[in-house]
Amino acid sequence: MDTPMLLVTNVNDAIQNDDLRMDSLTNENAWFLNNISYIFEDDEPIQQEDHSNYENLFIIDSDLNGKISGVELLSEKWQLLSYDQNKPYNCISLRVMDELRADLSPQDGDVKDLDSLARRYHDRNVQIRNLLDSLIQED
């Protein structure tokens, strides 16, 4: 199996730009992961390198033909919402969320009027809906 390309979309950025498309490699809210180390569960010798500075760990379960059976993200900051495999491009698209950004607390200085507060509530609702949708898909 060739090493797949990982394409990540941060749902929070997509929400702010009203663009939640996951079907395009040209999505402006997507980025390609770099500085990737691959760890395989087989008899190949493991590269000697320092693994202590890794921030995120993706566990990708696949068969010998490259069909993905599951993806898991171990991270203190990010939550994996969903993934999709694009076989022709040998690409795995990941949909992640880093945090609920829409802070609705009254001490937040940039809520100046009712429209900006309504926009924050809307953003928070979209984020929560995405989280719930990802939980429903897992069942």
Curated annotation (Swiss-Prot):
Keywords: Autophagy, Protein transport, Transport. It comes from the Eukaryota. Disruption phenotype: Mislocalizes ATG8 in the cytosol, when ATG11 is also deleted. Pfam families: ATG31 (PF09795). It is found in: Preautophagosomal structure. Its main location: other. One of its GO terms (biological process) is protein transport. InterPro entries: Atg31 (IPR018621). GO terms for cellular component: phagophore assembly site. Gene3D superfamilies: 2.60.270.60. Plays a role in starvation-induced autophagy. Involved in mitophagy. Functions with ATG17 and ATG29 at the preautophagosomal structure (PAS) in order to form normal autophagosomes under starvation conditions. Forms a stable complex with ATG17 and ATG29. Interacts directly with ATG29. The ATG17-ATG29-ATG31 complex interacts with the ATG1-ATG13 complex. Note=The interaction with the ATG1-ATG13 complex is induced by starvation. Kluyveromyces marxianus proteins are shorter in length and have a more ordered secondary structure than their S.cerevisiae counterparts, which might contribute to the superior thermotolerance and solubility. K.marxianus could be therefore useful as a new model organism for further elucidation of the molecular details of autophagy. Belongs to the ATG31 family. This is Autophagy-related protein 31.
